[in-house]
Amino acid sequence: MRQKAIFKIAVLLAFIGLSLMVSSIQLKNVEAFSNQVIQRGASGEDVIELQSRLKYNGFYTGKVDGVFGWGTYWALRNFQEKFGLPVDGLAGAKTKQMLVKATKYDKSTANKGTTTNKGNSGGTAQENKPPQNKGTNVPNGYSQNDIQLMANAVYGESRGEPYLGQVAVAAVILNRVTSASFPNTVSGVIFEPRAFTAVADGQIYLTPNETAKKAVLDAINGWDPTGNALYYFNPDTATSKWIWTRPQIKKIGKHIFCK
C-alpha cells in the first residue's frame, strides 16, 4: 500500500515537472515579443523581432530597422496568408506564436547587412540598433482616440453593410481629413455639422464591434475601395437634392460614393 502511494506521488511529481518545463518553453517563446499587438506605425524592439523573423522565413526583404512600414505590413500579411491566419497585417498573439513556431534563427545573423552607417559596412546590428521602444504602436499620424472615434463612426454609419462598405466609410473620413475642403482632424471631420447621420441621431455613441475597428485599420493602412470619394449616401433614404449632383464613383452595398 505504501509502495503504491510512493509510486503515485512520483508520477505526480514527474507530471508537475513536465508541466513546468513546457510552461517555461512557452514563456520563453512568448518573451520573444511583448504583449502588444504590433501594427503599421510601430517602432522598437518588437518590430526588430518581427522583421527578423519575417526575413528569416523569406517574407521580408527590407532592412531590419525597427520601423513598421509598408514593406513589413505586406510581408506580415503574406506570412499570415501562407500559414492560414487571419490576414489583417496585425501581429497579435496567434501571429506571434506562429512566427516563433516557424522560426529558429540567430537574430544577430538575421540583422547582418542591414546597417545604414556610411563607411562602415562591417558594423554590427547591435551597434546600429535604434533606441529600444516597445510602447509606440499607433499608425502614423493617428492617435488611439482617432481610431476609436472612427470605429464609432463606421459602426454607427455602416454596421449593416458588407465589410468592404465599412472600409469604404472609413476611407471617406480619411479622404476628408486630407482634403482642403474639410477639417484636417478626424474629430473635426466626424463632428462637422450635418456631416454624418450617426452623429445627428446619436448612433455615434454605440459601442463598435471588432469588425468596425478592423475596417478602420485597413483604411488607415491604405485600403480605399471608394476611389478617393469624399461623400456617400443611401439612395433609398437620402433627402438632399444636392448630394445627387455630386459625380458618382461607384456603389458599395447600399451606399453610393461620390467625389
Curated annotation (Swiss-Prot):
A Pfam match: Hydrolase_2
Compositional bias of type Polar residues: which residue ranges?
Answer: 126-142
One cellular component (GO) term of this entry: intracellular immature spore
Q: Which UniProt keywords apply?
A: Cell wall biogenesis/degradation, Germination, Hydrolase, Signal, Sporulation
Subcellular localization(s) per the UniProt record: Forespore
Leader sequence residues? 1-32
Cite the InterPro entries for this sequence. Cell_wall_hydrolase_SleB (IPR011105), Peptidoglycan-bd-like (IPR002477), PGBD-like_sf (IPR036365), PGBDSf (IPR036366), SleB_dom1 (IPR042047), Spore_cortex_SleB (IPR014224)
What GO terms in the biological process aspect are recorded for it? cell wall organization; spore germination; sporulation resulting in formation of a cellular spore
Q: Which SUPFAM superfamilies match?
A: PGBD-like
Region Disordered: start and end of each range? 109-142
Q: Which GO terms describe its molecular function?
A: hydrolase activity
What does the record give as the function of this protein?
Probable N-acetylmuramyl-L-alanine amidase. Required for spore cortex hydrolysis during germination. May form a complex with some hydrophobic spore component, leading to a stabilization of the enzyme in a spore-bound form.
Homology family: Belongs to the SleB family.
User: What NCBIfam families does UniProt report for this protein, alphabetically?
Assistant: spore_SleB
Instruction: List the protein's name.
Output: Spore cortex-lytic enzyme
Q: Which organism is it from?
A: Bacillus cereus (strain ATCC 14579 / DSM 31 / CCUG 7414 / JCM 2152 / NBRC 15305 / NCIMB 9373 / NCTC 2599 / NRRL B-3711)
This protein's encoding gene: sleB
